Amino acid sequence: MVDVEKMSDAELRAELNVRGANVGPVTGTTRSLYEKKLKKLLSGGAKTPARPTVAKPAPKPTPKSAPAPKSPKSPPARRSIPRAAATAANSTINSTFNRSEIEEMSDSDDDMRDDDDDDEEILSPKSKQSSFRSANSTASSVGRGRPVSSTPNKRLSPVYKPSPVPKNTPRTTSSSSKTTINTTTTRIPSTPRRITSVPGLITDFTPSFSTFGSDRPGATPPRKSIYTSKVSKVLHDLGNTTGEEDDDDEFEGQETSRIIYKTEEPSRRGIVKNAWNKVLGYGFDASKNPGDSYDLRAGASRIRVQKNPRTGKVTVKQTNIFNEAIYFALYVILILFVVLGIAYALTTTHRPKTADFSGYWGVLKAAGRDSLNFFYNYAILPVVSLGIFVVLGAGIYFGHRKYKEAKEQEEAKLYELIERITELIRESSIDGDPYVSQPHVRDVLFPPAKRRSAELARWEQAVKFIDTNESRVATDVLVLPSGNECAVWKWIGNQSQKRW
């Protein structure tokens, strides 16, 4: 018994070819399938068909006197290239096969199909060409010389699925008879084939891309580069790309968007919108001729650049948008005053005494006086009063806050001075001086340039705090040899030699 698993790829392929099986390239994924197929052939008792003895080579007949080859009975009719095209291309491959070998191939296929329905036939274009090509033939394919293209005219080969053959079909075997088969394809099917449609398989590239959801090489559909519908105008900014998106090396060299959106033309603004933009500082004007005059804005400043067409000099004027807003508010108040005066004149109960100009003039003066009183009582006086209250409240708040901050700073300076005085008294005690004069400490800490009223007032507060609250220091009065009294401090705390 031959050990199939120890065979090399070439030996496995040769054994399968000898037993009439169609073998493609033996790889890591197909070897297990071919091993199963060879084991089944060996276990089924399939014998190696006897190779026909090669007789003397007969003289090659001319194309005119060559007899027509007999077609085998077992394979069904199939598509073939016309005789004229085949003769012109010189692509006919003549191969001699034993009829019993062909029938054994169909028997082995039937047994395999009955035993295991899950095993599928693996075919590749290279294996189909190499398994049935004659060693001495040097013919070329029919389509040699045509350029390889991926245009929509390219067609892919359909998928063939073998159909089962009934068991009771009579088969005739003749081992001695030989049949010469004129093949125009790269493979001879052993059983009738039928075309089975596979969902999702693309067998033809057509100009219609209704069923395609993505781009195909060589068959790019026409694209609409401009969206003109009203609904798509809101998506104009979606096709824009930034430099950050193009920094990724993974998509380098690839376009980020195939859609070019149409730039929306600026719409015409009305009077109200122009006035509002002018108040906000966005109402820029530019001349029809480029470079004659235009506006710029930098923060709260507006810059007007204007070119003199005669001299060619450029004039730059700078204004502030807040000034324009103030003038605009004054204009609004004036317009409101005029409207109120007209409304008062039309609705007042005071009628002109005379129907001449003096009578109507009196009504207009009364309307102006009443309008001013209205503005003063309901606009100016409340605003001024509110402003005064706001200023007073803000002054009180910020004044109190400033007072607290100054008080905290003064307390911090006072405590810092107390620490310095205490440290000086302790150091004097360590050096061997039991008493320290208060004026001496003052002169050391405050030179004559710093003896101002604020510093002297802080010194008095520090002396008072030490005499009252400091337990490590005692205050005494010594009488000097001159008879004068002097206030001194004495350190009565810990006599440690450490210097802090």
Swiss-Prot record:
Give the Nuclear membrane side ranges: 1-325, 400-500
Tell me where in this chain the LEM domain is found: 1-45
Pfam families linked: LEM (PF03020)
Q: Which parts pass through the membrane?
A: 326-346, 379-399
Query: Which GO CC terms are listed, alphabetically?
Result: chromosome; nuclear envelope; nuclear inner membrane
Q: What residue spans carry the Acidic residues bias annotation?
A: 103-122
Where does it live in the cell?
Nucleus inner membrane; Nucleus envelope; Chromosome
Q: Which residues form a coiled coil?
A: none
Which spans does this entry mark as compositional bias, Pro residues? Answer: 58-75
When this gene is knocked out, what is seen? Moderate increase in embryonic lethality of progeny of X-ray-irradiated adults. Reduced lifespan to 18.6 days compared to 22 days for wild type animals. Decreased contour ration of interphase nuclei, nuclear envelope invaginations and faster turnover of emr-1 at nuclear envelope. Delay of daughter nuclei separation. Two microtubule-organizing centers (MTOCs) found in close association with nuclei during nuclear separation instead of only one as in wild type animals. RNAi-mediated knockdown leads to embryonic lethality and chromosome segregation defects in the F1 progeny.
- Output the Gene3D superfamilies linked to this UniProt entry: 1.10.720.40, MAN1, winged-helix domain
Task: List every stretch annotated Disordered.
Answer: 39-202
The record's listing under PROSITE patterns reads: LEM (PS50954)
Segments on the Perinuclear space face: 347-378
Outline the subunit composition: Interacts with lmn-1. Interacts (via LEM domain and the C-terminal nuclear domain) with baf-1.
Provide the protein name.
LEM protein 2
Q: Which gene encodes it?
A: lem-2
